[in-house]
Amino acid sequence: MKQELVLILDFGGQYNQLIARRVREHNIYCEVVPYKITAEEIKLKNPKGLILTGGPSSVYGESTPRCEEEIFQLDIPILGICYGGQLMAHTLGGKVNRAKNREYGKTALQVDGNSKLFKEVAQDSICWMSHTDFIETAPAGFKITGTTADCPVAAMENQEKALYAVQFHPEVEHTEKGKEILKNFLYEVCHCQGDWTMENYIEKEIEAIRNLVGDRKVLCALSGGVDSSVAAVLVHQAIGDNLTCVFVDHGLLRKDEGDWVEDIFRNQFEMNFIRVNAEERFLGKLKGVTDPELKRKAIGELFIRVFEEEAQKIGDFDFLVQGTLYPDIIESGTETAAVIKSHHNVGGLPEDMKFQLIEPFKFLFKDEVRIAGLELGVPEEIVWRQPFPGPGLAVRVLGEITEEKLHIVREADAIVRDEIIKAGLHRQIWQYFAVLPNIMSVGVMGDERTYAHTIGIRAITSSDAMTADWARIPFEVLENMSRRIVNEVEGANRIVYDITSKPPSTVEWE
């Protein structure tokens, strides 16, 4: 029996990946595809439904993204969200106009409870709006099923043709009944059964890897992070000792992290595990480098070189495991994607290395990889690890990297993490760490003047890392961090707390 599928046509909206995650939460497999996908290609995939995403364009723009008009004639249920709804209205003969008052933020919504889309949804609720254009007149054959004070067509539908549109964003948490609305589209309109589970996904991946690899050899670049760790465990379950894991220790890890990774994978999982100590080479390469992008590129290039050297020592292998995630795939295929920071990944390996990639999680999101890890029996301390950048502490030490600065930020970071765990906040806070901003300040310790480094503490709350707010850590916990760092970490005499959200800031300082 073929697995149910929902296709999400990507028009460049900021919440597109969030839509996919919400669909998956309802146990339905979905894929994000470019808006240029043809009606014929859609028919071949045989989806249960289509979702047209939001986007920054206007339907009247010269180069505005449009899907094929034939898509609306396929007899496949369609939900248009924001721009996707405007495009549906415009294409089918409705009228879209520029709003006098742009709607942005939480908005009071009134809906028709007789609509399948709003089954068991309160008539009055709050939704999240983010638009400049709006649907002024619904196309012929459509019924208006939702309104706001400034939006006469906040929702519309042609029930006979299973075409639905909403001007608001049901995928974001600020829309009170957003999850229920999406669930209604998937189950009441598309008649999905909900046949997608992590257990089934893992079984299929293990079987596919086993059939692909056979008796051949596989190499895994293991960082100790969630993605590569869970990928290594899954592949190891599929092929056993035919997998060899290479762990490049670049000397930019958190306190005791290298030893911890080695113990987990060599001793607990009994994998073929090779640890390469390359600290001197990396610190030598970073000497005098202060620009954050140059630091990232230097680390990435040397990582590739070290990994390639080790691979040649091992001998012939046919496959390489990578912990690539679905957002990487989506962003690489999206015309509107922009590079904010270069990403450190083994994907930059030389083309002349003859191997085939195994990417078991290339269709999963981060939270789904964590679920997969728990299903596979991966220890919780790995599954719930803090996100950690590939360049490691090199991007948490601003300016030039030195052994002294690394030691200071490493010790301070260990204290921050320890105090968060002691306070029982480690599951509530998405990410927390110490930063050395390369700022010296005057202090007094005992009867002596000091001139030492400032340490920044960064802690954020988030559900998806696309947006984040600074964590309201209790003052007594912050006080404990500050007191311990100043007393226990030589070279630090001032502690500051970062209270900036994302946006405008990014999570990492570099």
From Swiss-Prot:
The record's subunit annotation is: Homodimer.
Q: Which residues bind ATP?
A: S223, G224, G225, V226, D227, S228, S229
Q: Which domain of life is it from?
A: Bacteria
* Stored InterPro entries: Class_I_gatase-like, GATASE, GMP_synth_C, GMP_synth_GATase, GMP_synthase, GMPS_ATP_PPase_dom, Rossmann-like_a/b/a_fold
Q: Where is the active site?
A: C82, H169, E171
Name the chain's protein: GMP synthase [glutamine-hydrolyzing]
Q: What GO molecular functions are on record for this protein? A: ATP binding; GMP synthase activity
Q: Does the keyword Nucleotide-binding apply?
A: yes
Q: Which Pfam families match?
A: GATase, GMP_synt_C, tRNA_Me_trans
What are the residue boundaries of the GMPS ATP-PPase domain, all occurrences included? 196-385
Q: Which pathway, metabolic or otherwise, does it act in?
A: Purine metabolism; GMP biosynthesis; GMP from XMP (L-Gln route): step 1/1
Which residues are in coiled coils?
none
Domain (Glutamine amidotransferase type-1): residue spans on this chain:
5-195
